[in-house]
Amino acid sequence: MTAQLLSAWWLIVAACCAATVYALSAAFTMPRLGSESLVREAARRARIRGHVPVSVLKPLCGAEPRLFENLATFCEQNHPSYQLVFGVSSANDPAIAVVRRLQAAWPHRDIELVIDSRVHGSNLKVSNLINMATRARYDTLVVADSDIAVERDYLGIVTAPLADPAVGVVTCLYRARHVGGFWPRVGALFINEWFAPSVRVAHSTGSRDFGFGATLACSRATLQRIGGFAALKDCLADDYLLARHAREHGLATVLAPVLVETDVTEPTFATLWLRETRWLRTIRSVNPAGFASLPITFTSPWLVLGASLVALYGPHGALAPASTAAGMPAAALAALAASTVGGIVARIALHVRGSTGW
């Protein structure tokens, strides 16, 4: 076997093994995140510490599937004092009717609807937030995307870390729920078995370089310190950048122990492709190093490649005589075999964890 071929072979082995190590880490790191016991304990500590009044900002655009059901979870919070501010940019937005239903269903809940067409920059969601922020009455703010569903103790849990003056932003990891047929299922797998595990791995290595639109909790003082929502009006990844700007001012980003749910509704391959490629472009723009590591974090192709090579070149493979004659290292085949077994275990664990939330 030539030196070049041997080097290429060992490079493939190294990549397959690295993907397996990553998959095992992703499957088994932070096992209690989002667990019932951890959430219950976090809620208990939040109650002991005392709840603060909260203004929840929910920018809306269109009547998404399950919009009423998702927004209703914010109306059912076990929190003594909070305000819900919903915002749309058009008087014809069908989300208005959903907000009116919420107001009728929870007449004693502090629910306000802001209809304001002013545009402040290229990011229309941030323009909506700028228009809504003036109606927020409390000094603790929570921003959450429209397709998010939460548990009853959510507000207390995500705002509790803000009592520490060193904390700037609290964010939440999320679990995907498919709404519809095959393609929404694929989109949910992308979140549950690739994106969420990558965040867990990054967090376990000490990284706090994230901020998710599923939840961004901060104080009004922190928001003003970074320039308000106006500082994000022309930014693509506004959620990520809000947390990063706070970190640039020496304030920590905290990942809350509670998981929220997000809906995946794209009905066709084309719409799902647009969503995922837009997401990947966003990652590339804000985290080039993380984007460069994507080939390893997509572990299934490496697992298939490793298994195929073992099947072909292993002791009972069709190309076993050729590999022996060429001097293919037995250690490389053994490493590939071990990597394949470990990768299969990791993929099964990732799927179970993504499906059940353990």
Regions found by a protein language model. Give the residues of each.
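N-terminal membrane-anchoring/stem segments of glycan-assembly enzymes
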Residues: 1-48, 185-189, 197-201
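Membrane-embedded multi-pass helical conduit in multi-pass membrane proteins
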Residues: 28-30, 36, 297-358
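Cell-envelope/extracellular polymer assembly enzymes that use nucleotide-activated donors
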Residues: 52-55, 83, 241
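Short, acidic, metal-binding catalytic loop of nucleotide-sugar glycosyltransferases
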Residues: 72-81
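A conserved acidic beta->alpha catalytic loop
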Residues: 80, 88-102, 118-120, 148
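Long helical/loop segments within the catalytic core of UDP-sugar-dependent glycosyltransferases
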Residues: 101-138, 157-226, 230, 273-274, ...
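Acidic donor-binding/catalytic loop of UDP-sugar-dependent glycosyltransferases
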Residues: 144-161
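Catalytic donor-sugar/metal-binding loop of nucleotide-sugar-dependent glycosyltransferases
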Residues: 234, 240-262
